[in-house]
Amino acid sequence: MFTTALAQRENTQLGELPLDLFAAIQSLKKELNAVILAHYYQEPDIQDIADFIGDSLQLARAAEKTNADVIVFAGVHFMAETAKILNPDKLVLLPDLNAGCSLADSCPPEAFAAFKAAHPDHLVVSYINCSADIKAMSDIICTSSNAVKIVQQIPKEQPIIFAPDRNLGRYVMEQTGRDLVLWQGSCVVHETFSEKKIVQLKIAHPEAEAIAHPECESSVLRHASFIGSTAALLKYCQNSPTKEFIVATEPGIIHQMQKLAPDKHFIPAPPMNNCACNECPFMRLNTLEKLYWAMKNRTPEITMLEDIRLAALRPMQRMLEMSV
């Protein structure tokens, strides 16, 4: 039987919120010896109060190195799980346990176990955007920052399963020339961008560069002058002489882009429908208020079975070793 994370889903919110949430959270950080780790897709207030902001690889490294007793993870469930995998003795809190991930959910453990059994000679490289159960069935974990680098280090004669993101897998295939067996999972946000609307934006803004995350579909990626992880996109915008960018990833990252390059203009790539579908609904579940209550009540906590944690730790460690 597969068990991902056993978590306390009660987050009892008693009493009134303090008038100055920022000050109250800073006070709780000292009291708990806590660190707040936040992904680039979080709301601006959470990014501004976080001790560390990063992409999945940066956050995994920060979680591995922290001396804090409590890790408050402002991200989604698999990210908090990753912190727990690397820090079994620390209290890991997630402000809202319903902050899941459509990509992680697209790879059910039972179905993936059967898929893996059908390819017994294959090495399993799994994108970090997956559950602890999938990590436990993997040989190496990767992120969008290092996926190409990791696959390039695997002997060419070794067949590979790449899971769960088919778009990132396809991008890795193009960059490495390797033939990968792809699990057909995807991120609903990165598959919602409209190629037609991006082309229209490029016509309306001829000086703008389109940049994209490799989780996007190939029809979107072909219009991008730069493709990279969230951290790579940030660095590119900061260093490029271009003054205007069309950004094909979750628009939460634009907050950091504007802070790092205040003289530049960033246009979020539009979705196919007239909706806010380019915003991750799971990332948006975390709020400053929920972060405060999580620290105040020390719940919801991420826990998992030790055998799952140990099995998931090995491919995580291999990733960190191969990413030096």
UniProtKB/Swiss-Prot annotation:
Its cofactor is [4Fe-4S] cluster. Its EC number is 2.5.1.72. GO terms for molecular function: 4 iron, 4 sulfur cluster binding; metal ion binding; quinolinate synthetase A activity. One of its GO terms (biological process) is 'de novo' NAD biosynthetic process from L-aspartate. [4Fe-4S] cluster binds at residues 101, 187, 280. Iminosuccinate binds at residues 39, 56, 127-129, 144, 213-215, 230. InterPro entries: NadA, NadA_sf, Quinolinate_synth_type2. It catalyses: iminosuccinate + dihydroxyacetone phosphate = quinolinate + phosphate + 2 H2O + H(+). Pathway: Cofactor biosynthesis; NAD(+) biosynthesis; quinolinate from iminoaspartate: step 1/1. The keyword Ligase does not apply. It is found in: Cytoplasm. Pfam families: NadA. It comes from the Bacteria. Keywords: 4Fe-4S, Cytoplasm, Iron, Iron-sulfur, Metal-binding, Pyridine nucleotide biosynthesis, Transferase. Binds 1 [4Fe-4S] cluster per subunit. GO terms for cellular component: cytosol. Catalyzes the condensation of iminoaspartate with dihydroxyacetone phosphate to form quinolinate. NCBIfam families: nadA, PRK09375.1-2. Belongs to the quinolinate synthase family. Type 2 subfamily. This is Quinolinate synthase. It comes from Nostoc punctiforme (strain ATCC 29133 / PCC 73102). The lineage of its organism: Bacteria, Bacillati, Cyanobacteriota, Cyanophyceae, Nostocales.
